Regions:
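Internal catalytic-core helix/loop-beta-alpha segment
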Residues: 100-136
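Short basic (Lys/Arg) and small-residue
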Residues: 146
């Protein structure tokens, strides 16, 4: 049985400033490009049966710089849709909604999109996990995507509700490895850098 490797894209201007970034297609910063390239030695010798990326440029570029040959683009790997909070920091949101928490409240609709609840993001994560399940007996699977989405996917892989993704802080330009032990899913590595 292969492992599930989660690769968070390298740094962008908005990830550095703390702005919520879902559909805004920002490039990697020079530091983000460095982060992505430094992942190549961690991934070079893995027996990948499947490599999927988010459709957004920051994920596709991270995969390329990390030496991963993407076998497909999966729209379900896009980041949590932040709706009205796209481009806004948590600090700014708390000025008008002091008790707001993404993990319980989700994101409200905005002019550029509907926003998503934790449950909606969890359903996307479940679809991705179902799609990759058939490849895991043949080797490792890499998913190159985004912070909040990969945290939800981790929670779902471990059998937890989507909101428990809050427990897994995920840095830019890192690899996480989800494996199994005695037939049960486990976190084998988290926030690994070269």
């Amino acid at each position: 049985m292969g492992d599930l490797l989660l690769v968070r894209h390298g740094e962008t201007e908005w990830s550095r400033s703390g702005q919520h970034t879902s559909f805004t297609d920002l490039p990697l910063t020079p530091r983000g490009e460095e982060q992505a390239g430094s992942l190549a030695p961690l991934l070079a010798d893995r027996p990948f049966a499947l490599v999927l990326t988010s459709p957004l440029a920051r994920a596709v570029r991270t995969a390329a710089l990390a030496g991963l040959k993407a076998t497909g683009v999966d729209p379900d790997l896009h980041e949590w849709h932040y709706g009205a909070y796209e481009g806004v920091t948590t600090e700014e949101i708390h000025r008008t909604r002091p008790d707001w928490d993404l993990w319980t409240d989700g994101a409200p609709p905005g002019p550029d999109g509907p926003g998503e609840s934790p449950e909606e993001v969890g359903k996307r994560a479940d679809r991705v996990l179902a799609r990759v399940a058939g490849a895991l007996p043949e080797g490792d699977v890499a998913l190159v995507a985004h912070g909040h989405f990969l945290r939800v996917l981790t929670a779902r892989r471990l059998g937890l509700p989507p909101s428990e993704g809050r427990l897994f802080r995920l840095e830019t330009g890192t690899v996480c490895r989800l494996s199994t032990e005695h037939g049960r899913p486990v976190i084998a590595e988290w926030n690994t850098r070269a």
